[in-house]
Amino acid sequence: MANSASPEQNQNHCSAINSSILLTQGNLPTLTLSGKIRVTVTFFLFLLSTAFNASFLLKLQKWTQRKEKGKKLSRMKVLLKHLTLANLLETLIVMPLDGMWNITVQWYAGEFLCKVLSYLKLFSMYAPAFMMVVISLDRSLAITRPLAVKSNSRLGRFMIGLAWLLSSIFAGPQLYIFRMIHLADSSGQTEGFSQCVTHGSFPQWWHQAFYNFFTFSCLFIIPLLIMLICNAKIMFTLTRVLQQDPHNLQLNQSKNNIPRARLRTLKMTVAFAASFIVCWTPYYVLGIWYWFDPEMVNRVSDPVNHFFFLFAFLNPCFDPLIYGYFSL
């Protein structure tokens, strides 16, 4: 997960090892073959996601230039711009950090970067999830309350700003709970093996459990529920319109009808939600399993563990493909 609760960190980042525990040289983590494959795939996805998201930002920039010539940038394109920025931020922070950390196994960057990068990692994970919530809410309101959305142009900007603000606030505890530890051998002598972990930051075990559940809820459960509710409301509204008059699905801008462009953005919103579920569910299922059964690390093979966690890196790669497919 985003902190020391994950089995991925337990295996590869030694985050489940407290600095007071004595280790032998043979117990220290190493870079395995499956770890090397994971690193290779991670950096490949990093290049892919960077290229896709940067290309879409350039395309949006061209639309922005057209806006200066009198063509207004649509509300949906503004939302897509911020989602792309959030995806690019996640790509540039999380993927290189994960790849390099798996290569080095231990932490060499010092305590300051341990705290700062842990904060930036969680911030860059919150931002895309919250932007997905904003898009789902905006599209739901555009269908269920079109006149209210059209008359309130500030609502979209407010939700976007709130998403960025909450991302920065909710990631704040990372600056406090992460720290460097130095592990010792069986004789008590320091071996020079250091790690960036959260151990010793929580007075009681349930404090860490609460923090883990909070981050899990904000990163996955709450966004997922909001997206499902919004998409259900959209489908219900569309079904009701079609039941009243099957010919209502016309290509005009009447408040009672659904223009084709809006239908296209609705399909894209559903595709975003599906991508979010497919990519993040394996990642969090593995994390939750570890919370309730830490010994699962010894039962789940290393390749399976790495494979499940790589799913999360597919999400920022898929989103630009979804943009392109629906040709906004």
From Swiss-Prot:
UniProt function note: Receptor for gonadotropin releasing hormone (GnRH) that mediates the action of GnRH to stimulate the secretion of the gonadotropic hormones luteinizing hormone (LH) and follicle-stimulating hormone (FSH). This receptor mediates its action by association with G-proteins that activate a phosphatidylinositol-calcium second messenger system.
Tissues in which the UniProt entry reports expression: Pituitary gland.
Organism: Sus scrofa
Name of encoding gene: GNRHR
InterPro entries from the UniProt entry: GPCR_Rhodpsn, GPCR_Rhodpsn_7TM, GphnRH_fam_rcpt
This protein's record includes keyword Transmembrane: yes
SUPFAM superfamilies for the chain: Family A G protein-coupled receptor-like
Pfam families hit by this protein: 7tm_1 (PF00001)
Protein name: Gonadotropin-releasing hormone receptor
Extracellular side: 1-38, 98-115, 185-212, 301-306
Stretches that traverse the bilayer: 39-58, 78-97, 116-137, 165-184, 213-232, 282-300, 307-326
Membrane topology summary: Multi-pass membrane protein
